[in-house]
Amino acid sequence: MKKILFVLTLGLAMVLTSCGDQHKAQSLVKDFLNENLENEDCSFKRFSQLTPTAMIDFNRVKSMRQEMNQLPYMKKNIDYNDGTFPDTLMYLRATYQLTTHDGKKEELTQTFYLDKALTRIIAFKEN
């Protein structure tokens, strides 16, 4: 009986922790976009599950940053609060609706790469 209770408690703790990380990652992405969109009028539609990846290297991050610096609806020279490049990144896809300067609505899906501690956005790309 004690083993069953232990396993159930451990499972519940894991579920609550992963939900907390998902929420923290979503909040980080929302804050990043609110700070770096030229026009802050966006509404979020959905987020993917937070997932780890080791497939992105520093050169790919630099390339993504240069590409995203060209987007007309993003501020130029975004500050990514650079620190040590992590071995493993976490990624999250966000779909949101952006209202452009001329009032048109545009739906965008982007992938955001975060550090494992979920304290900063490392890079992002359009899908």
Predicted regions and their residues:
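Cystatin/cathelin-like cysteine-protease inhibitor module
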Residues: C19-N127
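Sec-dependent bacterial lipoprotein signal peptides
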Residues: M1-S18
